[in-house]
């Protein structure tokens, strides 16, 4: 009896091992992993509400928002394929309207039925809405910071613009001064030309004076000699 029971136990163990191997080889997981994110339809609606463009949100913007705010994993090509299929179904059903493009490409916005539900106050999703409030606050802070930046930049440009104008004025004044300095030597040269004949005449006057001085001693000497001769 004991030997037969041992054989039965070994046979049962072998059968269970074969069943478990077949189960794994066929690709059936032992337990399904719990999803850490809501459905793709809810995530798409949350992304469109957060982006809130009047003309619609592009698929790339929706995918970026989903990847940043939901735990969808790192396999973005797989997430993109799911997103495309859900967008096509939502456009066909009328939950989402396609403003531009065809198929899964283009821009999308909320459908009329979803907008009515939002106006009445029926929440489309529960968990992501809490995240959307935080995201909206961050977006508002970013938009405020972007609005304040242009004013500072404009002030800086104005402050920098004034010295440029003054430098231009200084450059013009320096050019004018240089032109005046260039004109000044010409005036001096003209003055020298005018003074030329005067110098010649003055030279003649000096020569005449010298001649008179030379002539005067001769007359004095003649007078002296004349007086001496008279005394003798």
UniProtKB/Swiss-Prot annotation:
Domain of life: Eukaryota
Positions of the UniProt region annotated as Disordered: 142-232
Xref: InterPro entries: H1/H5 (IPR005819), Histone_H1/H5_H15 (IPR005818), WH-like_DNA-bd_sf (IPR036388), WH_DNA-bd_sf (IPR036390)
Basic residues composition-biased segments: 159-197
UniProt keywords, alphabetically: Chromosome, DNA-binding, Nucleus
GO biological process: body morphogenesis; chromosome condensation; egg-laying behavior; locomotion; multicellular organism growth; negative regulation of DNA recombination; nematode pharynx development; nucleosome assembly
The keyword Nucleus is assigned to this record: yes
Domain H15: from-to ranges: 36-112
Pfam families: Linker_histone
Record's GO cellular component terms: intermediate filament cytoskeleton; nucleolus; nucleosome; nucleus
Location in or out of the cell: Nucleus; Chromosome
Location, primary (coarse class): nucleus
Coiled-coil segments: none
Gene3D superfamilies associated with the record: Winged helix-like DNA-binding domain superfamily/Winged helix DNA-binding domain
Molecular function GO terms recorded: double-stranded DNA binding; nucleosomal DNA binding; structural constituent of chromatin
Similarity comment text for this entry: Belongs to the histone H1/H5 family.
Protein name: Histone H1.X
């Amino acid at each position: 009896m004991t030997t037969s029971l041992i054989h039965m136990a070994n046979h049962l163990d072998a059968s269970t091992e074969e069943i478990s191997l077949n189960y794994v080889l066929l690709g059936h997981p032992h337990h399904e992993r719990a999803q850490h994110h809501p459905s793709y339809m809810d995530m798409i609606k949350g992304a469109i509400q957060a982006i809130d463009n009047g003309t619609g949100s592009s698929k790339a913007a929706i995918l970026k928002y989903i990847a940043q705010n939901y735990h969808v994993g790192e396999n973005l090509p797989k997430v993109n394929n799911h997103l495309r299929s859900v967008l096509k179904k939502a456009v066909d059903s009328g939950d989402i309207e396609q403003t531009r493009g065809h198929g899964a490409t283009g821009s999308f916005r909320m459908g009329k039925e979803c907008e009515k539900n939002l106006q009445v106050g029926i929440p489309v999703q529960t968990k992501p809405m809490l995240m959307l409030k935080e995201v909206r606050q961050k977006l508002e802070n970013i938009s405020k910071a972007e609005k304040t930046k242009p004013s500072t930049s404009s002030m800086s440009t104005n402050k920098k613009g004034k010295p440029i104008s003054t430098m231009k004025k200084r450059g013009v004044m320096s050019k004018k001064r240089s032109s005046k300095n260039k004109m000044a030597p010409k005036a001096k040269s003209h003055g020298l030309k005018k003074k030329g004949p005067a110098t010649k005449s003055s030279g003649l006057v000096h020569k005449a004076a010298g001649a008179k001085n030379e002539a005067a001693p001769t007359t004095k000497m003649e007078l002296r000699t004349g007086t001496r001769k008279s005394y003798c």
